Amino acid sequence: MDAVAVYHGKISRETGEKLLLATGLDGSYLLRDSESVPGVYCLCVLYHGYIYTYRVSQTETGSWSAETAPGVHKRYFRKIKNLISAFQKPDQGIVIPLQYPVEKSSPRSTQGTTGIREDPDVCLKAP
C-alpha cells in the first residue's frame, strides 16, 4: 500500500479532511487507514465542501473492493491502483469521480488552494 502515492497511512479523519479541504477542488481524494476498523482503508473524496468516505478492503484472496452507494454492484480488483483507476470514471457508485490525487509526498507548504503547485524559487516580473 505504501507504493500508492495517495496513501497517507495512519492519519486521523480530521487530518484527512483538512488536506482535502485545503485543495478546494471537488474530486480531490486520498486513502488513509480506517480509525475504527483495523485492516480497512478509507477512500476520502471532496465534493461541495463535504468529505465522503468509502471503506476499501482487501479480501482473503488479495482482491480489493470498495463500499459504494446501495444498489451498485460490488466490484473486485487485483490491485488497489486498478480500483482507483475505475473510480476515476463517472457512475461508479461514488459521489464524484476521483480527479485530483492528494499525494502524501506533496509538499503542503507549496500547495496552493488551486491545487497547482507553485515553486517558491521562481518569480516572474512584469516588464
From Swiss-Prot:
The modification N6-acetyllysine is found at K89. InterPro entries: SH2, SH2_dom_sf, SH2_prot_1A, SH2D1A_SH2. It is found in: Cytoplasm. Keywords: Acetylation, Adaptive immunity, Cytoplasm, Immunity, Innate immunity, SH2 domain. Interacts with CD84, CD244, LY9, SLAMF1 and FYN. Interacts with NTRK1, NTRK2 and NTRK3. The gene is SH2D1A. Its main location: cytoplasm. Residues 67-92 are annotated as: Interaction with FYN SH3 domain. It comes from Saguinus oedipus. The keyword Transcription does not apply. The keyword Iron does not apply. Residues 104-127 are annotated as: Disordered. It comes from the Eukaryota. Cytoplasmic adapter regulating receptors of the signaling lymphocytic activation molecule (SLAM) family such as SLAMF1, CD244, LY9, CD84, SLAMF6 and SLAMF7. In SLAM signaling seems to cooperate with SH2D1B/EAT-2. Initially it has been proposed that association with SLAMF1 prevents SLAMF1 binding to inhibitory effectors including INPP5D/SHIP1 and PTPN11/SHP-2. However, by simultaneous interactions, recruits FYN which subsequently phosphorylates and activates SLAMF1. Positively regulates CD244/2B4- and CD84-mediated natural killer (NK) cell functions. Residues 116-127 have a biased composition (Basic and acidic residues). GO terms for biological process: adaptive immune response; cell-cell signaling; cellular defense response; innate immune response; regulation of immune response; regulation of signal transduction. One of its GO terms (cellular component) is cytoplasm. PANTHER family: INOSITOL POLYPHOSPHATE-RELATED PHOSPHATASE DOMAIN-CONTAINING PROTEIN, SH2 DOMAIN-CONTAINING PROTEIN. Residues 6-102 form the SH2 domain. This is SH2 domain-containing protein 1A. Gene3D superfamilies: SH2 domain.
